């Protein structure tokens, strides 16, 4: 029997039910439920359907004039009645995605302490490092299957937001549910409060986190280790997603734990998966292969290098050598293009640095090769921005790229919108509508010479909900590189532009449930093939995906003994 139709037996009654967002139905409680659960007189007389409630909520939502107020309003509904919240979001997913997540969630993180209203998730501070097990036991969610955790040090492109970073795990898990059908009862946002180095927060009397500099070194490593072990003891099968950790910690934590626990880093691996999926779709639309492209990155941090490594892996799978693939990828950071003779390169950057002997013939060869120099010499067909610095894809750079590439692929992926390397409008006008553009944040369609171009949002929300659903449906114990690659290929298979030769590079958000299920199947099948999940048939796997897919419908309640 469908869980959404099976009665739920509750051992409590009265106002407590109305204060529990996972089970509150508000005006939708039936006459029978109002009698049995002592709710008579606590609600208006009329019994409403969830659609009637959602219609009223949407009317109220439209009364707010700015995005932050809309975000706060939706969060209040989420903290009051989660089923209604997800029905409302699912009814207006394209309109509300930028409100519940990027770019609006960035403002919410900056104002987290000032706008704080109600608890959600867990805050685990370093001061309580010896009581992590007790804190996990205090969670209102008992059957946790997906955790998103941050330490708040690198929130979007906004830097250290301390515990204000909690807005990101809350928002990400909202997308796991609204896009991937993960029951909100199975999700838990967690913030590790290890202090902050943001002077504005340290001086802010309203700041609600630890007012001390961030811990680091062995103290930090041991604290995260204690957290991971405690989570594994409490919920041994939970999927853990690392979110918005600083570069110096993100890759080491991923390398340390990816083979120990079922975990992944969305900034590194999720971003890489959705970017590769988008590139595969663009290549398919252009009737070419990724291994034929020359790719330049602006931004050589953990996210950029993670994408680059995923691209190299895909190129190798298409038949070229790893050495050749790396010669076709050019990484540029604030000091110029990464070269093998540069000092102080991080380990994950060293593998992507160009050999100096291969580029000595370039014009303007020096120790500091600019992005424009790379475009003029390497003649890239793909340009990807993950720098967090706005406006760096200049008209000169885009036109130089277009001069040697008829249909340049340009992905300014930095979030939020204020940090984008160039707007789609500028890129398309500079290339007379010839560029294939995808962005990290949402943008309106662009009109060039009476032709309207839909702007694909190369957002991780296309990928991680499907990964989560695939892990849950298969019971996978790890998230492997092959599973992530499978998610990229599955996403590319859903591209309207690749399928029909027209439309957006990525599917419409209205189709996200179909996309997530398609990705979930590919991820789960790969997990089984690699031995990370128990064998099953395709038919049973499809059934498991549907069985795990939660929809925003009210269940009937029955009273049980206290």
Swiss-Prot record:
Alphabetic keyword roster: Metal-binding, NAD, Oxidoreductase
Enzyme Commission code(s) on record: 1.1.1.38
Membrane-spanning ranges: none
Catalysis performed (reactions): (S)-malate + NAD(+) = pyruvate + CO2 + NADH; oxaloacetate + H(+) = pyruvate + CO2
SMART domains: malic, Malic_M
Protein name: NAD-dependent malic enzyme
Site, Important for activity: residue positions: 267
Native organism: Shewanella pealeana (strain ATCC 700345 / ANG-SQ1)
Chain positions recorded as NAD(+) binding sites: 154, 267, 415
GO cellular component, as recorded: cytosol
InterPro entries the UniProt entry points to: Aminoacid_DH-like_N_sf (IPR046346), Malic_enzyme_CS (IPR015884), Malic_N_dom (IPR012301), Malic_N_dom_sf (IPR037062), Malic_NAD-bd (IPR012302), Malic_OxRdtase (IPR001891), NAD(P)-bd_dom_sf (IPR036291), NAD_malic_enz_proteobac (IPR023667)
